[in-house]
């Protein structure tokens, strides 16, 4: 016997769309935009890590991150 929870009842409408395909491109353009933004975020983090992005008056070192 399955346990019914409030969270399960809230998530049930999401599961009712299982297996259905949105017509046309659906949300693909939105996904592409978020992937591009995530790539930009990763590039900025990498540049900060490599110190190739110059941040004035901000000392970034592992010793300052320690507690």
Curated annotation (Swiss-Prot):
**What is its subcellular localisation?**
Plastid, Chloroplast thylakoid membrane
Q: Which InterPro entries does this chain map to?
A: PSII_PsbH, PSII_PsbH_sf
One GO term (biological process)? photosynthesis
The family database entries (SUPFAM superfamilies) matched by this protein are listed as: Photosystem II 10 kDa phosphoprotein PsbH (SSF161025)
The entry lists its GO molecular-function terms as: phosphate ion binding
- Annotated membrane topology: Single-pass membrane protein
List the GO cellular component terms: chloroplast thylakoid membrane; photosystem II
* Membrane spanning residue stretches: 29-49
Task: Say where the protein is mainly found.
Answer: plastid
Keyword Cytoplasm annotated: no
Q: Which UniProt keywords apply?
A: Chloroplast, Membrane, Photosynthesis, Photosystem II, Plastid, Thylakoid, Transmembrane, Transmembrane helix
Subunit structure and binding partners: PSII is composed of 1 copy each of membrane proteins PsbA, PsbB, PsbC, PsbD, PsbE, PsbF, PsbH, PsbI, PsbJ, PsbK, PsbL, PsbM, PsbT, PsbY, PsbZ, Psb30/Ycf12, at least 3 peripheral proteins of the oxygen-evolving complex and a large number of cofactors. It forms dimeric complexes.
Q: Function of this protein?
A: One of the components of the core complex of photosystem II (PSII), required for its stability and/or assembly. PSII is a light-driven water:plastoquinone oxidoreductase that uses light energy to abstract electrons from H(2)O, generating O(2) and a proton gradient subsequently used for ATP formation. It consists of a core antenna complex that captures photons, and an electron transfer chain that converts photonic excitation into a charge separation.
NCBIfam families with a match to the protein in the record: PRK02624.1
**Family per similarity comment:** Belongs to the PsbH family.
- What is the protein name for this chain? Photosystem II reaction center protein H
- The species is Cyanidium caldarium (Red alga)
Q: What is the lineage of its organism?
A: Eukaryota, Rhodophyta, Bangiophyceae, Cyanidiales, Cyanidiaceae
């Amino acid at each position: 016997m399955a346990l019914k929870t409030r969270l399960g009842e809230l998530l049930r409408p999401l599961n009712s769309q299982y297996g259905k395909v949105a017509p046309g491109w659906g949300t693909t353009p939105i996904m592409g935009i978020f992937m591009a933004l995530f790539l930009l975020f990763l590039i900025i983090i990498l540049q900060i890590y490599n110190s190739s992005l110059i941040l004035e008056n901000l000392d970034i070192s592992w010793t300052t991150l320690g507690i």
